[in-house]
Amino acid sequence: MFSFNYTRGMLLTTAALGLSLGQVAAAENWPTFRGDGARGISENKNLPLEWDAKQNKNIEWKTAVPGLGWSNPVVHSGRIYLTSAVSDGEIEPRKPGLYFGGDRKEPIKHMHHFLVLCLDLKSGEYLWQKEVLASRPLTPIHIKNSYAAETPVTDGERVYAYFGSHGLYCLDKTGKVLWKKMFKPYEMRNGWGTGASPILDGDQLIIVNDNMEDSWMASFDKRTGRQLWKTKR
């Protein structure tokens, strides 16, 4: 288990995933951003219509998550996967609401730990945490962004985590890194990041890198990491 100085000011809950533990055995997988097919639709007919974390209303469990990450959790075969980035030092606090001037010209100076995390869906207990990279950030980010913005994707056997300029990682169900790819850092529009989460299409893993210099889309063999094609976008 990792111990870091900075902790998310939010908790991961089963209600946030739209899953009731009374339905876990029959619950559908939610393997990618916006669910299966990226449709944003659940076939579960017994979802809670309201919940309150403070009052524990329709909350099965709560688990603190280290670091900062805008990525969504994904679910497959009773496991939850998510990503986070943990700073060794203090970072600028996030502000609510809309405002201008949130882009930053320089990367955050502190060392960051880029994590892939796996939790048990029924209990919320950590099964493993894997640090895939420890590095000072290569690119600036907007004040409302994080260094773990892209949602991972899983096929149940492997989980694929994309941290933009900080790499693409394939891990097995035990947290072992099977392969990784590193990419040239580019200037991003207002520090918003790469613009998309990875997807799986058969044996292909497809990612987008939307930037201000040389935007591209690429496909990799999901088992080996071999690049299959790359094109400008």
Report residues per predicted region.
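Bacterial N-terminal signal peptides that target proteins for export
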Residues: 1-12, 21
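Intrinsically disordered/low-complexity terminal segments and short unstructured peptides
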Residues: 6, 12-13, 31, 223
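Noncatalytic, solvent-exposed loop/strand surfaces
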Residues: 23-233
